[in-house]
Amino acid sequence: MKSSMAATGLVAAAVVGLAVATSPTAAAADLVGPGCADYAAANPSGPASVEGMSQVPVAVAASNNPMLTTLTSAVSGRLNPQVNLVDTLNNGQYTVFAPTDPAFDKLPASTIVQLKTDSNL
C-alpha cells in the first residue's frame, strides 16, 4: 500500500510529459502529447522508440526511455529503497502518465529529498 501511495503522489507531483504506449499496435502517428512527435523522430527505432516501448512491460519501457530516468529511479527503488513498483508495473496492464526529467527538474529540491526519505508520499 505504501508503494502505491508513493507512486500516486509522485506521478501527481509533475506535469504529464510523455505518455508511454503499451499497446502492440502503437505507432508514432497515434501520439497526441506535446513533444511526442519530436520524441518519436529522435528515437525512430530500438528499445527507446514508441514501437519498442509498446512491446515491453511498463517499467521496462520507462527504463528504456532517456527522458524518464527520474521516474524510473522513483518507481524502481533507486530513489527510495522502500518504494519499488517494478513488479507491480510489469505484471499488469497500466496507462502511466509519465513525468519527464524536465518536469521533475521543476520540483523544489526539497521535494526530491522528501521523496527519497518519505515512502508515504
UniProtKB/Swiss-Prot annotation:
Residues 55-121 form the FAS1 domain. The keyword Signal applies. Keywords: Secreted, Signal. One of its GO terms (cellular component) is extracellular region. Residues 1-28 form the signal peptide. Its main location: secreted. InterPro entries: FAS1_dom_sf, FAS1_domain. It comes from the Bacteria. It is found in: Secreted. The keyword Lipid metabolism does not apply. This is Immunogenic protein MPT70 analog. It comes from Mycobacterium kansasii. The lineage of its organism: Bacteria, Bacillati, Actinomycetota, Actinomycetes, Mycobacteriales.
